[in-house]
Amino acid sequence: MFQDNPLLAQLKQQLHSQTPRAEGVVKATEKGFGFLEVDAQKSYFIPPPQMKKVMHGDRIVAVIHTEKERESAEPEELIEPFLTRFVGKVQGKNDRLSIVPDHPLLKDAIPCRAARGVQHEFKEGDWAVAEMRRHPLKGDRSFYADLTQYITFADDHFVPWWVTLARHNLEKEAPNGVATEMLDEGLERQDLTALNFVTIDSASTEDMDDALYAEELADGRLQLTVAIADPTAWIAEGSKLDNTAKIRAFTNYLPGFNIPMLPRELSDDLCSLRANEVRPALACRMIIAADGTIDDDIAFFAATIESKAKLAYDNVSDWLENNGTWQPDNEGIAQQIRLLHRICLSRSEWRHHHALVFKDRPDYRFVLGEKGEVLDIVAEPRRIANRIVEESMIAANLCAARVLRDKLGFGIYNVHTGFDPANADALAALLKTHGLHVDAEEVLTLEGFCKLRRELDAQPSGFLDSRIRRFQSFAEISTEPGPHFGLGLEAYATWTSPIRKYGDMINHRLLKAVIKGEAIARPQEDITQQMAERRRLNRMAERDVGDWLYARFLNDKAGTNTRFAAEIIDVSRGGMRVRLVDNGAIAFIPAPFLHAVRDALVCSQENGTVQIKGETVYKVTDVIDVTIAEVRMETRSIIARPAA
């Protein structure tokens, strides 16, 4: 009787449209209940029974109920699930398998089975890739997933690497493929094999991209020739190897090992500028004045070179600092080091006055045993030899940026526009409260940005610098020439690492067209998106493996009185994040560890400060002593507390 009643349907429709609803993201807690976060200000309580229909991170629409003046959300419609493809640990065996996602806020096991075509017989503790197939808000009775890929077994020592690479869907090994002979590119190569080119790298480096040669001219100016490995002499555009490199976009450097962009035969041998081996190269010759200015007369050309020495950063630095026992093999090599050192000092001085110089931060190197165990973590400060190479590469990339801009009008450029214009007024207001007066318009120009950066570098601490970082825009990869505010340069195009960066290979092909005087098509925009995405994934993978190894390394320090110096890098409502100075590990100090009385404590992300009873006790960039309270291996998180 009521089945097709239009009045009833209308009433239902009316009730539905009058019921308040909200769209937001589900935030789970460890207590079983959750919240629907609509925006930064508004959230609704989700009771435990309703949480069974959703997962942390799901974007949903929920019906809002009000009972006794208390609002709660009942999930109704799934807009976007948090989990689609994920990695996790398998539980159970035979026909009753489930998988626990590897995520700090997802604790519930999801029933699953091996997908069609997956041969592996899964057992307890296995790591796997899974894809969600069912969701309660899609009309299914429960969550359900398919296991689409076996990663590794529970006790594999290399779990951090294999799981991380699978999580980000990145390659595990070097690409296959060989390049049997060099291409005929119609390039005349200058024979520079007699010159004393040298490479300076880490002692363990096999993929040597760059070799340097310097000489003093009659007028006292210095001439620098930068020779770069030439993979595009072996790899034709559009070939299988080229397409593989295009997809990978970069060599992926992880603690302990790398996954190259090119086959190892090329990256570590045929293209690598090995000592006493004749190699094809793309070269740039520039003349540098005493004040570090690069002359307009820049020459790019194809060459054949033979590196005369594989030098290591530490040896060269020790020798220049008159330390240690290492000596260059002969006077010719010694003279090269001295000239390159002079170039480094004059270029560094030039950049100091006319561009920007980064503050030196140490690199942290994991020393690993045979089974992936962390034997030590070594802070490697950037020494004078690192700076010699850095200054030479920046100079060479600046030359390429100019030549590509002037001759073609395009290339693969690293572009950074400084501050987001939408933030200029807020930035000026913040600086004013700290006694720095900047013009909101001027600070958006390259010159204004450089001026501000120099003022910030002159401050007694990096506190103010850390406060304005949130106003900065991100660096981008673009085919259009544009300024790089972070370096303080009018344009910057890298071509000095073609073995490990696909964008540099593209710039090689463009520079070769310039050398030959040929027309060449502008690179497609989609390649810049692929490179940006790969760079993001590789960085996340490096961070994830690092977190795992730090947790392993510091696990036995939990609960002990071992003190670590730690720099405060961020303050949030829940506490503060610190970086351990000696090894680079990131740890979290929860607010209750800062002060027992919550009402007397104010942790302000906005100001980067922690106040107790109205007085600032901690601020970002402060260095404090901490001890390790706890290491949570399942989430790879390190909890610290201020040392008593």
Swiss-Prot record:
Keyword Membrane among record annotations: no
GO biological process: mRNA catabolic process
Reactions it catalyzes: Exonucleolytic cleavage in the 3'- to 5'-direction to yield nucleoside 5'-phosphates
Subcellular location, record wording: Cytoplasm
Annotated GO MF terms: exoribonuclease II activity; RNA binding
Residue stretches making up the S1 motif domain: 561-643
Listed EC numbers: 3.1.13.1
Biological role: Involved in mRNA degradation. Hydrolyzes single-stranded polyribonucleotides processively in the 3' to 5' direction.
Designated name of the protein: Exoribonuclease 2
